[in-house]
Amino acid sequence: DYGMRAVKSVLDAAGNLRRKHPDMNEASTVLTAVNQINRPKFLIDDLALYSGIIGDLFLNVEEPVQDNSLLVRAIEEVGLAQNVHNHPAFLNKILELREMILVRHGLMIVGDPLSGKTCCYTMLQEALSLLNARKELPCDLNPKHELKTDVFVINPKSISMGDLYGYNDLVSQEWSDGVLSKIYRAASACASHSDNRKWIVFDGPVDAVWIENMNTVLDDNRKLCLVSGEMLPMSQYMNMVFETLNLDQASPATVSRCGMVYMSAPDCTTSAARGNTENPGNNALLNEAAWVPHVRAWLNTMPAVVSRNPVLVETIVLLYKWAIPPLVNLMTDELKSCQMLPASGIAMVHAVNRMFGCVLQTHWASAAAEEE
């Protein structure tokens, strides 16, 4: 999508950059804005082509480095508290999500299961709330951007359209708010006495059955139109976030109205794995950066006899590095036809964690009994 909505988003991003960095030259401002809007929605293999096109359009123009040190430190603190390893690729996705939220009131986070979609926006929420709590510190905070954030999560496919948007009772003809209309009404009303950001997250498949009624919310009207004839306005601190696996059933009209952040699990895979066109799922975990953080986070939850023993932790990680790649290749190649349900490589790693944890706990219990 490179229509007028995309152009307007680039102009909004450029305006924000101009106000934040008035000394930045115009070419660098436009280049940074274009990258902020377009880079998050590309696959890892498409970024090289995109970078080449941008390099031809902006000759001898360098993109200035953005100072996000305050937000990065807050994200690292949140990651430490939530037992999340802040891999550079994942940290970059969080920053991309934050930039997208500032220029688009509707956005989609697309990715496979366990690719970090939920963790991405929850960590950003906690980091922004943490920065907001530190307003008394001598920090260069933008009160419009670093605000305490409230999140409301809805599964749109778990309820009917009437329960989602609201309905008129057939007998009494009285209007009853649905889940979305009730949350939307409360979030819009809070704007008059609260500056907290409100994110309404739709965690589920995106299809034309329920999302077409959101078109007036996602475009410049920013109003939720109910079947009762009521129109609920959206405040400037509200965002509609769609967390979904893919956009196969979404219409182009809906996609063009939203910003896009693609959480690609193969972001950390090797070029050799990405070049395997016969079986895209094969070798998806050859690069350790894609799955070792999951193992280290799991080891942090183990008893102190393991988590506080760095030698034992590194030994277990080395065993995983030796065993996981061939096991994943075996499951995705030779045993693929035996799987009742397809599983991603990260899901297989989590399954190994659970089974290995059971073995270790049995061993520790017997060892403790012998010591007693």
Language model features: what each stretch is:
Residues 149, 219-220, 250-304:
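A short helix-turn-beta junction within AAA+ P-loop NTPase domains corresponding to the substrate/partner-engaging
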Residues 129, 169-193, 197-243, 265-266:
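Conserved catalytic/switch belt of AAA+ P-loop NTPases
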Residues 3, 97, 164, 214, ...:
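Conserved RecA-like P-loop NTPase ATPase core
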Residues 1-107, 114, 275-372:
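Alpha-helical lid/collar subdomain of P-loop NTPases
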Residues 127-172:
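AAA+/P-loop NTPase substrate/partner-engagement loops
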Residues 104-105, 146-150, 196-197, 221-222, ...:
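Short glycine-/polar-rich loops that comprise or flank the Walker A/P-loop
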Residues 104-123, 206:
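Walker A/P-loop nucleotide-binding motif
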